[in-house]
Amino acid sequence: MCSSDLDFVAPDNYSLDAKGFAEVCAAYAREDNPFFMPETIGDANMFRAMGEYNCLGNFFFGVEVLLTPEGEVRPERQTTIDSIQCTAAAAPLLLKYQGTGKIHTFIQEDNVPTWEKELDGFSILAEYGDKRAPWSGKDWRHRSPGWMPVPQAKFKAAYGLVFQAQKHEFYFVGANVRFFLRPQLTPQTVGSSVMLGDSISQNFSFIVSVDEGHFDKNGEFVVDRKRNGDEIGRRGFWVEPDIKVLRVITCD
């Protein structure tokens, strides 16, 4: 039975595979039906729902199972906590840019080590996991076991969002990933910029600033930590949930 008072139809989406999850999203994300999921699993697929299908919100059924009776995060639920943290940090960007084509989603799939995308004036390569070199370029808080004598989380899948707000203004949120950014090649520059396996060899003079930060209540970006040196060059721009949002400003 149809009703003129029905605002929208919202699905429960418990599909575990990426294709099945996307099919449910596509079936309900229509111009005549605002897309909301009242029940779903809090995993990396939520980024696909928000970034590709303009999902207005997700409700994680059974969210109380994230914590132990003592209030500690259950290790097997850390990915859900991380995804919530990334989403909260990116909320102002999602509200501003959903439906504009400025949001790009990446989610690691089996046996796929990278993700590539052509943006406005730039090419981007996302490399999943830690860099395969003895030193990854990350700070002491985020390096993998074997290189720093501090406890580190076990391997986790990579996921997140890329926002190109303006041609030279980028925002990144996600987990277990690093990005390599370069101006798109022209016949004049193709000889001086080449992809070499897990890195990009090039001139980095187009990078103006790389900042970790967050958005305040007015939607303004606040810098918490400025990166420099090896953290912004050939080792890429790495992101993890606890750094919130990474902003990269470039120039011609």
Segments predicted by a language model, with ranges:
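Acidic-and-aromatic substrate-binding clefts and catalytic sites of carbohydrate-active enzymes
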Residues: 12-20, 40-44
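C-terminal functional modules
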Residues: 133, 137, 149-252
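A short acidic, amphipathic alpha-helical/loop segment
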Residues: 20-27, 45-49
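Aromatic- and carboxylate-lined catalytic core of secreted/periplasmic carbohydrate-active enzymes
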Residues: 46-186
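Structural recognition of the beta-strand scaffold that forms the well-ordered cores
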Residues: 7-11, 35-38, 57-60
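Short, small-residue-biased leader/transition segments that mark boundaries at the very start
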Residues: 2-3
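A short helix->loop->beta-strand "cap" motif at the edges of active sites that frequently abuts
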Residues: 30-34
